[in-house]
Amino acid sequence: MNALHTLTTLQEAVDWLRQRVTGTLQTDSRLIQPGDGFIAWPGAATDGRAHVGDAVARGAAACLVECEGVEPFALAGDHIAALRGLKAATGMIASEWFGHPTQRLQVLAVTGTNGKTSTAWWLADALNQLSKEELPALAGCALVGTLGMGVPPALQTTGMTTPDPVRLQRAFAQFAEAGHRACAIEASSIGLAEHRLDGTRIHVALFTNFTQDHLDYHPGMAAYWQAKRALFDWPGLRAAVVNVDDPQGAALHAELQGSDLDLWSISLQGPARLQAKHIVHTGAGLALTVAEGAHTEVLQTQVIGLYNVSNLLGVIAGMRALGVPLAQALQACARLRPVPGRMEQLAAAGQPLVAVDYAHTPDALHQALAALKPVAAQRGGRLWCVFGCGGNRDAGKRPLMGAVAQREADEVIVTSDNPRGEEPQSIIHQILLGTIAGTSVRAEVDRAAAIAQALAEAGANDVVLIAGKGHEDYQEAAGQRVPFSDMAHARAALARRGGVA
C-alpha cells in the first residue's frame, strides 16, 4: 500500500477527484471517456478494482477504489487513491460531485415487497398530467425504477430497480436541469442496504406492503425489513405514507406517530387518514369512494385488483403530501392506465382475456389471481395461470407460489421464468413440491410453448394470467439473454385462434 495514496474522509475524496477529473464520474469502466473519474469497489458479481486498468486505458483521469482488500490488485500511481468504506460513501460523493441535485427536486421514494413499480409510475404520470393542465407550477415529475429512468413512457433501461449511486445522482442532476421539480423512485431493500440512495434528499417515503422476497440476498426477514425501515428514518424526511392494512405497515405507522413527519395512513379495510370505501367492479375498472376525514370523492379507475386500489391510495396520499388538492389528485388518478407488464390486458371479442403481470412473489401471485377471479366469474369462464420462478433467487418462495397458483386458479401450467444459472427442470420441481398432484397442474419447461398451450386450450370466456416476467423483453438462461416477450407470445397465440389483440 506504500505506493497507493490513501484518503481518510469523504470531503478529501471529493477534493481529490475535483483536482483531477475534467469529465464525469463512472462506476462502469466500459463507459469511461477521457478525463472521467472511475469509482471501483467489490460487487456481488465482479470486483470493480479489477477493471482499473481498462478504465485507465480508456482515459480515466482518476480512479478511486475501495481500500480494504486492495493489495492483490497491485494498484499504484498518482491517478489512483483508496478510501475505506467507499461503497457506502459513493452516494454522498456523487451527490456532492453533481451539486446536490435533490435539493432542487421533491423526491418521493416508494418501498415495499410489491407495488413499488405501479405506485412510482403512477405518481410520475399523475403529477405530469397535473403539471400540464391543472397545476403547471409542479413542472413535471421524473421516474427511477424497475422500468428505467426518465419521464414515462420514455425511459432508459438500467437493469436495476435502484441504480448505482453515481448513475442515480447524475440522473437527478439531469432531471433538475431539464426543469423537473419532482422524481418518484423505487427504493428497493437491496438498494437501501447498499447505500445507493445515500446523499439523496427525500421528501416523501411511501410503504406499500411487506411479504417474503429477496431472501437470497438478505439473511432473513428481519434484515429484509430493517433495510426497508431505514427509509422512514431518513435525514430530512418530511412526510410518510403507510399502508396500514399490512401488519408490518400498521406497526410502522404506530412507531411513526408522534414524530415530526406529515403522516398519512391509507386503508381499504378500516379507519385511516385516507380510506377507500364502497369498492365495486365496473366495465371500465374499479370504482370507489375516497374519504379524507369528512371529505369524500368518487373515483372511477381504469384498473382492476384491490391491491391496485391500495397502490392508488398511496399515489393520492403522496400527492396530498406535496400539497395537491384531493379533487385534483383524483382527477389525475381517474386517467391512469395499467403500467406496462402490471396487469396489462389483451382483449378481443370471442377470445379469452389475457393478463400479463410481473407477479413473482407468493403474495403478488395471490393478489393477481384474486383480482382476476371475479373477472373470470363474471365472464362465466375458468381462470388459468402460467408462471415460473427465477433462478438464483429466493428458492423458498417456489413451493409457496405453486400452492398459491393451485389454490387460486382452475388450470395451472408451471414453466420457466428466467432460469439464469439453474437447471429449469429443477426449479419447476421445487414449485411442484407445493402442489397436490392432479389434473389441474401440469408442467411445460418451454415458456413459449406453455403460453401457446394455455391459449390454445382456453375457452373464449376464460381468463389467462401469464405471471412473473411482466414488462421484460428477454429470457435469461445459462448466462445469456434471448429476446422474449410474454405479451408478444400471447398476441401470437391469440392470432392463431383468429383473435385480434
UniProtKB/Swiss-Prot annotation:
Do you know which SUPFAM superfamilies this protein is assigned to? MurD-like peptide ligases, catalytic domain, MurD-like peptide ligases, peptide-binding domain, MurE/MurF N-terminal domain
Localisation per UniProt entry: Cytoplasm
Q: Where does this protein chiefly localize?
A: cytoplasm
The protein's annotated catalytic reaction(s) are: UDP-N-acetyl-alpha-D-muramoyl-L-alanyl-D-glutamate + meso-2,6-diaminopimelate + ATP = UDP-N-acetyl-alpha-D-muramoyl-L-alanyl-gamma-D-glutamyl-meso-2,6-diaminopimelate + ADP + phosphate + H(+)
Q: Place the motif Meso-diaminopimelate recognition motif on the sequence.
A: 417-420
User: Would you kindly state one Gene Ontology biological process term found in this protein's UniProt entry?
Assistant: peptidoglycan biosynthetic process
Q: Which Gene3D superfamilies does the record associate with it?
A: Mur ligase, C-terminal domain, Mur-like, catalytic domain, MurE/MurF, N-terminal domain
Can you tell me which residues bind ATP?
Answer: 112-118
Which Pfam families did the record assign? Mur_ligase_C, Mur_ligase_M
Q: Which residues carry this modification: N6-carboxylysine?
A: 228
Q: What Gene Ontology terms describe what this protein does at the molecular function level?
A: ATP binding; magnesium ion binding; UDP-N-acetylmuramoylalanyl-D-glutamate-2,6-diaminopimelate ligase activity
Does this entry carry the keyword Cell wall biogenesis/degradation? Answer: yes
Q: Give the EC number(s) listed in the UniProt record.
A: 6.3.2.13
Q: Which GO terms describe its cellular component?
A: cytoplasm
Protein family:
Belongs to the MurCDEF family. MurE subfamily.
Q: Record's NCBIfam families?
A: murE (TIGR01085), PRK00139.1-4 (NF001126)
Task: Write down what this protein is called.
Answer: UDP-N-acetylmuramoyl-L-alanyl-D-glutamate--2,6-diaminopimelate ligase
Q: Which organism is it from?
A: Acidovorax sp. (strain JS42)
Gene name in the database record: murE
